[in-house]
Amino acid sequence: MTNIRKSHPLIKIINHSFIDLPAPSNISAWWNFGSLLGVCLMLQIITGLFLAMHYTADTTTAFSSVTHICRDVNYGWLIRYLHANGASMFFIFLYLHIGRGIYYGSFTFMETWNIGVLLLFAVMATAFMGYVLPWGQMSFWGATVITNLLSAIPYIGPNLVEWIWGGFSVDKATLTRFFAFHFILPFIITAMVMIHLLFLHETGSNNPSGLNSDSDKIPFHPYYTIKDILGLLFMVLTLMTLVLFSPDLLGDPDNYTPANPLNTPPHIKPEWYFLFAYAILRSIPNKLGGVLALVFSILILMLFPLLQMSKQRSMSFRPLSQCLLWVLVANLIILTWIGGQPVEHPFIMIGQLASVIYFSIILIFMPIISLMENKLLKW
């Protein structure tokens, strides 16, 4: 009699994906983030579901319903802060996961990489709409500013914005539809994650050397399940420390003031994980130019497979490319810092400089350095 794990139609799929999956023997802790992202997604869906049971998507009661969750619902404060800080963890892992993909050349799996970029867009859209739901000052003004960017689209822009708003300003209709989309998108993301994994399992995982590892595979379970559990423990420790000791560390105090269309906050800014893109948006004086730069700052990831000039896949043995990648990381940290600063001298200049450097590194310097390294190795 064959093992049910290998014969049952459904369990067989799980077996091939998480148990008997042949994995490279040398993948490092950088390969943990995929599973951590999966755990984050499940955590967000579960906590979000419980929050939705008590939340009301109406401009008059949204803010007070969130207050009610925190004060009156059993462990409501815990669920709410797990959800809010879980989003921050999600983005930390996303950025590390993408960074790993760039460093080790995982973007050569074109289908996996491109669906990953689409996943990033979907997660960003979900997070943005979720930030609007508590209906605080930053929720309202963030929604107004970001949706208003669409008015930069020639000809259809203004009509498009009013269509998204469901009226002539961000109001009840906007909040209701944002709640609907915020609820449905994580399930669409889950489906996209399955496609992401499907494409990945077509080729198998990459590894730190960037070489073909077909001759040296080990089963995913128990070797990498136990390794993923260690990563999970670190994640739980970090998240619970954040939630239980300083739950508002990454939030904005302005969001504890109910939304008021008649009073604009002095500094409108999104959550920390969008600040780098927000800085790029603000660094261009032209509205349409800024919007294009904002979209392209993420869309540029899709160009990585086309800009790969090196004969080696991974950066493990390419010190010049490594240096350049770390300059890019430092530049992104600077952009994140600038995005949270007021629009005044010297921050405007620093933001513009950092934006130019960001695009230059990816589009110009990385391919040139790769070609130089090929020459150094007489390739």
Curated annotation (Swiss-Prot):
A single GO molecular function term of this UniProt record: ubiquinol-cytochrome-c reductase activity
Family that this chain belongs to: Belongs to the cytochrome b family.
Name by which UniProt lists this protein: Cytochrome b
Organism: Octodontomys gliroides
CC annotations in GO: mitochondrial inner membrane; respiratory chain complex III
Record keyword Cell membrane present: no
Transmembrane segments: 33-53, 77-98, 113-133, 178-198, 226-246, 288-308, 320-340, 347-367
Co-factor binding details: Binds 2 heme b groups non-covalently.
